[in-house]
Amino acid sequence: MNEKIRNFESNQMKKDIPPLHPGDVVEISLWIIEGNKKRFQIFEGMIIAIKNRGLNSAFTVRKISSGEGVERVFQIHSPVIKEINIKKIGVVRRAKLYYLRNLKGKSARIKTRLHVN
């Protein structure tokens, strides 16, 4: 029984996911369905947390929009995600960057290395 579940989950997992790390600035293309129209929308921000749980793996992305912090949790293997692009690689020493919620302006920046696809 356990082997059947493991095989099913491995078949459902996406294979083309780039390696994600906290502090990375990513651009996520999402499929949005409105009525009978299907389009994609881009959400760009910094990864502040990753939860590795096999098929249920998720990551939290934070961005500042109109002066307000917006956080969104994405399932890594979700069919809603069209693609994930890494814009910058962050250099951090923490697994969870929740402290960024309390920082504003230049103090909320982290060191980055430029990433070229």
From Swiss-Prot:
It comes from the Bacteria. One of its GO terms (molecular function) is structural constituent of ribosome. GO terms for cellular component: cytosolic large ribosomal subunit. Keywords: Ribonucleoprotein, Ribosomal protein. Pfam families: Ribosomal_L19. One of its GO terms (biological process) is translation. This protein is located at the 30S-50S ribosomal subunit interface and may play a role in the structure and function of the aminoacyl-tRNA binding site. HAMAP family: Ribosomal_bL19 (MF_00402). Belongs to the bacterial ribosomal protein bL19 family. This is Large ribosomal subunit protein bL19. It comes from Blochmanniella floridana. The lineage of its organism: Bacteria, Pseudomonadati, Pseudomonadota, Gammaproteobacteria, Enterobacterales. The gene is rplS.
